[in-house]
């Protein structure tokens, strides 16, 4: 019953809302979320005058911001938290799923989603910083879409409200999404460890839940652990990929040719496969970099910075790191393997086969450990996101905060034995609903963030004149 309901909602969000006929009898299926996300990304890229490229140096400089309150987070720490969730399941299992279903061309559309999505990420993170509030439970600040949606509707109606329906729907969708992701985490880690070490999934899941509980049930341990874990795991994965690319440098041009050909190739269009290529690239790009979904603003709001746009710059950079760098690493690992060796494989089995081809048994062990670290950091990150949404729904009390953490731990356990397709669908449903509520409000509130960007650039220009 529940599985059927999830599948029906998934079909509405991610299924083909429009069918565009193509030469040769095929068609391109366009989902509701693509209709929302792609125009939003293009619109904000135009309105910010190509911010991801034009202001890339400012994104890097924004990471050097200092903080005065020990309970608040620096811009760099909020990047770490958001990167923990971005550089996680989507970068490994998500890329595998995209390429398996949509071919190499899906990688190109993941890149496009990231480039235009960076502008969307800037807008939503800047809004979160502008509408943040003090957090009486954890200290520092909190916020996110539930909060800026609330402020917008209060401002429009002129009435003070305890809760706003759209904010409530967003917060509930977020909690559903993060429960779904919790299941994906244990499901994928358990399968990976079974393939690499022949450890029964139940044992792996139990250990994962215990380790997570030790950290998340403590007040402020999450950020401290992520500060150490995320840079280490990302750098290790990046350099292993560089080694693989260097040792297969002769095949690299062919990989890029294949990506471009399958992204636009006549074979895909005539066969009607272009829709699958586009859909899987965009869908997994969103699941990985979260631009427009409203997740990362929950971290952006926690930053202590002198200008709201700096929080926006930080999250725009996070999208670049996630998709252009880390997701590309996974894609290269897969696409540098002869296609016949990967035939008939899916999920982590496919990725581990690719790593075994490149690095032997060490590759299988490395990707299993990497998946564990990526997944563990993702779980910690999504529970950080959940804080502000739980507080919005249930108020400032430790009972509700602890209850959701326990629920997420239960979902983490259940995911180890759940069906692979169902747990992905649950996560996709949650992130899809979040994206609908958030993207619509971004069109309405985006002008606020754009005005902050204009003020920032005017001040920078004035400062240059003085110097």
Regions found by a protein language model. Give the residues of each.
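Helix-loop-helix module between adjacent transmembrane segments
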Residues: 40-45, 116-141, 150-187, 191-215, ...
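Extracellular/periplasmic helix-exit of transmembrane alpha-helices
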Residues: 124-136, 242-258, 272, 302-305, ...
């Amino acid at each position: 019953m529940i599985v059927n309901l999830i599948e029906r909602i998934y079909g509405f969000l991610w299924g083909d809302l429009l069918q565009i006929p193509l030469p040769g009898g095929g068609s391109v299926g366009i989902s509701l979320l693509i209709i929302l996300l792609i125009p939003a990304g293009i619109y904000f890229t135009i309105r910010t005058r190509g911010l991801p490229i034009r202001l890339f140096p400012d994104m890097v400089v924004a990471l050097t911001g200092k903080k005065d309150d020990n309970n608040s987070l620096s811009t760099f720490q909020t990047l770490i938290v958001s990167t923990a969730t971005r550089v996680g399941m989507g970068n490994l299992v998500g890329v595998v799923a995209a390429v398996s279903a949509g071919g190499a061309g899906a990688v190109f559309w993941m890149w496009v989603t990231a480039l235009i999505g960076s502008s969307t990420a800037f807008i939503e993170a800047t809004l979160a910083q502008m509408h943040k509030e003090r957090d009486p439970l954890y200290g520092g600040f909190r916020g996110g879409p539930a909060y800026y949606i609330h402020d917008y509707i209060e401002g429009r109606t002129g009435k003070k409200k305890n809760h706003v329906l759209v904010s409530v729907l967003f917060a509930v969708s977020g909690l559903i999404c993060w429960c779904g992701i919790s299941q994906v985490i244990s499901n994928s880690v358990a399968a990976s460890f079974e393939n690499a070490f022949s450890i029964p999934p139940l044992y792996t899941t139990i250990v994962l839940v215990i380790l997570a509980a030790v950290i998340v049930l403590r007040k402020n341990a999450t950020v401290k652990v992520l500060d150490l874990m995320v840079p280490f795991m990302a750098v290790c994965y990046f350099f292993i990929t560089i080694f693989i690319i260097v040792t297969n440098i002769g095949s690299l041009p062919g990989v890029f040719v294949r990506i471009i050909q399958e992204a636009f190739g006549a074979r895909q269009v005539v066969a009607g496969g272009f829709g699958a290529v586009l859909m899987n690239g965009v869908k997994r790009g969103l699941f990985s970099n979260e631009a427009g979904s409203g997740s990362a603003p929950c971290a952006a709001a926690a930053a202590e910075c002198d200008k709201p746009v700096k929080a926006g710059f930080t999250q725009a950079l996070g999208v670049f790191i996630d998709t252009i760098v880390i997701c590309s690493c996974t894609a290269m690992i897969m696409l540098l393997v002869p296609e016949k060796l990967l035939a008939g494989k899916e999920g982590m089995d496919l990725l581990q086969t690719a790593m075994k081809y490149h690095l032997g048994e060490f590759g299988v062990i490395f990707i299993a450990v990497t998946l564990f670290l990526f997944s563990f950091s993702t779980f910690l990150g999504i529970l950080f996101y959940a804080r502000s949404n739980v507080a919005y729904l249930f108020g400032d009390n430790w009972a509700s905060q602890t209850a959701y953490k326990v629920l997420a731990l239960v979902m983490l356990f259940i995911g180890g034995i759940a069906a692979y397709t169902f747990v992905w669908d649950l996560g996709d449903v949650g992130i899809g609903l979040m994206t609908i509520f958030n993207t619509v409000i971004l069109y309405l509130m985006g002008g606020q963030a754009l005005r902050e960007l204009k003020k920032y650039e005017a001040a920078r220009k004035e400062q240059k004149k003085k110097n």
